[in-house]
């Protein structure tokens, strides 16, 4: 019974690895080959029990064990996946004589060849080992996290959290709560035992409580042999591709357990901290900065009581939130804005024109679309449209759960929502008025 059950779980794990690599795309030929392989395994599991001792089932099970915890959104995926593929290929070679004529074996060999071609894996190079003690890398979070799970018999991959800040400013917390806040001045987004992130927000327009981010400071704390403390700082019109000490990486020069990658000069950089499994995106859109972070839950929640003021963890203080709790306001989408100084300040933007401009970039009318409309009406700055769009792109790149990418303000089916933090469909007008009080 054990041999017959294994391929089924293997198929699910292999499919999950492919889905993480290309979310939302049609299954590639490779996945179909793997599914065919595992289906054949279900039908012919008995083939591996013949006196010749074909061990293709063991090779396949080991490969699934080595790859089921990997995630393509995290730095180092390709390297680890190729190592596992080479180990899989080596295993099939060692059992080739015993598996001659076995359809499952030959399907596996074909699948491995296609996988290595699609992933651009070289045939020569390091391989993964099914013994986690051998492959343990203290400066690769995914390596030692996977080893711990393997020892415990836990096949669930590490849990990751996402936090983002953009626009006027809009905060998405680790709990997927969505808030619009004032938070003028310097505020900590994250302050745990591994990472500190602080943002500084300044007023956007005179007479308004709306602010936006013009400075970001990130401290990667020293981590024994993996990296010395590294500080990154970005301000408006100065988005460097290096830490403040002039370096672009931390730790061993070959391993690069911490590194900066410049994607668009002066506008977009990424920081990959392999030793803590963390990825940070920093962008400048218009005059202001945006931030997106993906971090393992066990590390993100590792902090002392004195570090409880973290916007990514607990959200903005109530006194700093711009919410719709100031009165009973009916849904205003499709209605006209009241005649206020806001309309006089930016006559080019009405609710209708703001909706139209935001819809061009974001066809799904989720909370990011609503934030875009809100920012246009409160600031008159068209760059906030691009900021909301890039923030959504960062969610799609870093958020671990695809079903939570879009947050809908009026959702009643369990979809994450801003709740009392921001219910845009019930309060855009009220929010705009509050900003200018």
Swiss-Prot record:
This is Repulsive guidance molecule B. The keyword Disulfide bond applies. Member of the repulsive guidance molecule (RGM) family that contributes to the patterning of the developing nervous system. Acts as a bone morphogenetic protein (BMP) coreceptor that potentiates BMP signaling. Promotes neuronal adhesion. May inhibit neurite outgrowth. GO terms for cellular component: endoplasmic reticulum-Golgi intermediate compartment; membrane raft; plasma membrane; side of membrane. It is found in: Cell membrane; Membrane raft. Disulfide bonds join 139-226, 163-312. The gene is RGMB. Belongs to the repulsive guidance molecule (RGM) family. Residues 1-45 form the signal peptide. The record marks 168-169 as: Cleavage. Keywords: Autocatalytic cleavage, Cell membrane, Disulfide bond, Glycoprotein, GPI-anchor, Lipoprotein, Membrane, Signal. GPI-anchored. Residues 121-133 have a biased composition (Polar residues). Residues 414-437 form a propeptide. Homooligomer. Interacts with DRGX. Interacts with BMP2 and BMP4. Interacts with the BMP type I receptors ACVR1, BMPR1A and BMPR1B and with the BMP type II receptor ACVR2B. The functional complex with its receptor NEO1/neogenin appears to be a heterotetramer with a 2:2 stoichiometry, RGM molecules acting as staples that bring two NEO1 receptors together without interacting themselves, this arrangement leads to activation of downstream signaling via RhoA. It comes from the Eukaryota. GO terms for biological process: BMP signaling pathway; cell adhesion; positive regulation of DNA-templated transcription; signal transduction. Its main location: membrane. Residues 121-153 are annotated as: Disordered.
